[in-house]
Amino acid sequence: MQPIRYRTDLTPYNTFGLRAQARAFIALEHADGLRDIVRLPEFNRDTVLWLGGGSNILLMEDYAGLVVHMENKGIREIARSDGMVLIEAQAGEIWHDFVLHAVALGLNGLENLSLIPGTVGASPVQNIGAYGVEAKDVIHSVRCFDLDTETFVTLSNADCRFAYRESLFKQEGKGRYVIVSVVFALKTHFVPNLGYGDLAAAVAELSAGRVPTAKDVSDAVCAIRNSKLPNPNVLGNVGSFFKNPVVSAEKAATLLQRHPDMPRYPQPDGSVKLAAGWLIDQCRLKGFQIGGAAVHDRQALVLVNKNNASANDVRQLAQHIKFTVFARFQVELHAEPNWLPASFSL
């Protein structure tokens, strides 16, 4: 186990690039080290921050507790049968690198999730999703360290209680389970998921008349994301800042009467998912800036650190967007990233 570092700068560990320090910081390179970490005098399960890629957090002030950076790596095949392969990835693996690894192995199901920032360990927490695929569609099980019993446990897909950008790990399991690895069920036979029009068009162009491959889909997703989303290494951001709101069919019908071109996605339960980026764009907020934080000029769903943004700049900008969208559409937006501490959340 690496030694604890004190007063550690967390700016490189959060993709929005907010300036903050950790009172204490330690890197976890092997899951077994968790048994030692929970016995450290600096450890308090109520205040510890389990940190992955830092792509889904907003550090609003210096972190008063212990920060554990998950750096455990490794990918291995567990089982293979009937066109299905179970593959385990450690929590510290970079998500996009893992997706590319699976595609290169001919394992299918992750390609639509290419270029999502963060680590494998974060994928079940947020139930990450893009272009018609969510993590829950491919996760077989999640291996965790249970802080209640200080033992390793395996949770099935059903145990994780996945929902849209939600999971057990954000609800009643928050603060109890530390994700150490994720097992994915991937297919050896490729069936493309091209329900989104811009993705279908991009794949058709790449495949040029031949049968498309998973690599074609992955490459197309990367091209689309790169054209719309800023690179966090160049311009700090946390990807999509707001969840796509889900409204009743009646509410959607009312909005459609006034906005017939409004994108909408009917859900199996009869509700309708709306495009948060479209709602923000209709309020003419692209490029709008408060302090050093701004709405990206090409993608309204992304807030960026344009000029050494402070935590307060980000909060004020997010609040302005929420109020403006609600005033026009009577639809409430909710932020995707986690505000730390949670008392700052809107």
Curated annotation (Swiss-Prot):
<keyword id="KW-0961">Cell wall biogenesis/degradation</keyword>
<keyword id="KW-0521">NADP</keyword>
<dbReference type="InterPro" id="IPR016169">
    <property type="entry name" value="FAD-bd_PCMH_sub2"/>
</dbReference>
<dbReference type="InterPro" id="IPR006094">
    <property type="entry name" value="Oxid_FAD_bind_N"/>
</dbReference>
<dbReference type="GO" id="GO:0009252">
    <property type="term" value="P:peptidoglycan biosynthetic process"/>
</dbReference>
<dbReference type="GO" id="GO:0071555">
    <property type="term" value="P:cell wall organization"/>
</dbReference>
<dbReference type="GO" id="GO:0008360">
    <property type="term" value="P:regulation of cell shape"/>
</dbReference>
<comment type="similarity">
    <text>Belongs to the MurB family.</text>
</comment>
<feature type="active site">
    <location>
        <position position="336"/>
    </location>
</feature>
<keyword id="KW-0573">Peptidoglycan synthesis</keyword>
<keyword id="KW-0131">Cell cycle</keyword>
<feature type="active site" description="Proton donor">
    <location>
        <position position="240"/>
    </location>
</feature>
<keyword id="KW-0285">Flavoprotein</keyword>
<dbReference type="InterPro" id="IPR011601">
    <property type="entry name" value="MurB_C"/>
</dbReference>
<dbReference type="GO" id="GO:0051301">
    <property type="term" value="P:cell division"/>
</dbReference>
<keyword id="KW-0132">Cell division</keyword>
<dbReference type="GO" id="GO:0071949">
    <property type="term" value="F:FAD binding"/>
</dbReference>
<keyword id="KW-0133">Cell shape</keyword>
<feature type="domain" description="FAD-binding PCMH-type">
    <location>
        <begin position="18"/>
        <end position="189"/>
    </location>
</feature>
<dbReference type="GO" id="GO:0005829">
    <property type="term" value="C:cytosol"/>
</dbReference>
<protein>
    <recommendedName>
        <fullName>UDP-N-acetylenolpyruvoylglucosamine reductase</fullName>
        <ecNumber>1.3.1.98</ecNumber>
    </recommendedName>
</protein>
<dbReference type="InterPro" id="IPR036635">
    <property type="entry name" value="MurB_C_sf"/>
</dbReference>
<dbReference type="Pfam" id="PF02873">
    <property type="entry name" value="MurB_C"/>
</dbReference>
<keyword id="KW-0274">FAD</keyword>
<dbReference type="InterPro" id="IPR036318">
    <property type="entry name" value="FAD-bd_PCMH-like_sf"/>
</dbReference>
<keyword id="KW-0963">Cytoplasm</keyword>
<dbReference type="GO" id="GO:0008762">
    <property type="term" value="F:UDP-N-acetylmuramate dehydrogenase activity"/>
</dbReference>
<dbReference type="InterPro" id="IPR003170">
    <property type="entry name" value="MurB"/>
</dbReference>
<dbReference type="InterPro" id="IPR016166">
    <property type="entry name" value="FAD-bd_PCMH"/>
</dbReference>
<keyword id="KW-0560">Oxidoreductase</keyword>
<comment type="function">
    <text>Cell wall formation.</text>
</comment>
<dbReference type="Pfam" id="PF01565">
    <property type="entry name" value="FAD_binding_4"/>
</dbReference>
<comment type="pathway">
    <text>Cell wall biogenesis; peptidoglycan biosynthesis.</text>
</comment>
<dbReference type="InterPro" id="IPR016167">
    <property type="entry name" value="FAD-bd_PCMH_sub1"/>
</dbReference>
<feature type="active site">
    <location>
        <position position="165"/>
    </location>
</feature>
